[in-house]
Amino acid sequence: MNEIKKTYKNYVGGKYVRSESGKTFRIELKNEFYEVPLTSRKDIRDAVVAAKKGHTAWQKLSPYNKTQVLYRLSEMLVGNFETYQQLLQDAGLTKAKAKDDIHKAVDSIIWYAGMADKWEQMTGNLNPVAGDFFNISHQESLGVVFTLNSNTQSLNSLLLNMLPALTVGCSVISFNEENSVLALKLAEDINNSDLPGGALNILSGKFELLIEDISNHVEITAMAIYKEIHNDQKTMIKENASKSLKRIFINPPTMGLEALFPFIETKTVWHPKGR
C-alpha cells in the first residue's frame, strides 16, 4: 500500500483551509520534505475577518472560561506527546531536548491559563486623584494581533509567541515560516481545545512577500515580531503602521506579567464617592 502523506493546511476561523494562492513551499525535516501553504494577501485578509469574529467570541467568555480553554490545550499536548517529540527530533533536537521542550510548553500553557482570570486584578489599580472621586484604571485587550513567530524549532517558543496576546483576550494571527510544520500540527490540537473559531489563526508562508500588506492593514491592531528581521523591514513596518496607529513590538517579552503589557490598553473610570 502506498504511503499517504499528510496535507498541511492553514488554520483560519476554526477551519483548515488551503491557500488562495494554490501554492506551497517546501520544508525539510530529517531528509523528508513537507509542502506547506504559501499564504497570499487574500489569505491575510480572510484571516483578519476571521480574527475579528474570533475576538468577539473570545471576549464573551468569562476569564474563568478562558482559563479552562487554555488548560484544555495543555491536556491535548500531553495526549499527543509522542507526535510532537517525533517532529522535534526530525527537526534536529535530541530525544532528551525534545521531551524537555514539550514539558516546558505544557508548563507555559498552564502558567498562562492561570493568569487568564488574574491579570486584570494585577494590572489595574485605584488611582489617587484630587476631589471626591474614585479613579480606576481598567485594562482591555487591543483586538486583532499579528505575530511573526520565531524560526526556532521549539514547541515552547512557538506557544510563547501566541499565549501572551491570547491570554488577555486578543485574537491572534500566528504567522510561521521555518517552523510551519510544527505550528500547523499544533493547529489540530487548538481545534480540539474549545477555543472559539477565529480566536487563534495559524498561517504558513514567507513574511517578506506580505510585509507591506500586513503592516498596512488597518484592522490589525498590533504586530508582535518575535523573529529577527532586517532593519529596513522594521522601518517599513513602523512607517506603514503609523498610518493606522498600529502598535509595533519588536522582540517583546514572552514570559511573566510584563509579557501581557503590550497587548492591553488602559481606560480610566471616574465615579463620585458617596457621602
Predicted segments, located by residue:
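Conserved active-site and cofactor/substrate-binding residues in soluble primary-metabolism enzymes
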Residues: 42, 46, 100, 104, ...
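Conserved NAD(P)+-binding/catalytic subdomain of aldehyde/semialdehyde dehydrogenases
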Residues: 129, 135, 139-148, 193-275
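Alpha-helix N-cap/helix-start motif
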Residues: 20, 81, 98, 155-158, ...
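N-terminal Rossmann-like NAD(P)+-binding subdomain of aldehyde/semialdehyde dehydrogenases
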Residues: 1-131, 164, 177-178, 192, ...
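Conserved small-residue-rich beta-alpha loop and adjacent elements
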Residues: 110, 114-193
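Residue-level signal for inorganic ion chemistry
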Residues: 30, 66, 169, 200, ...
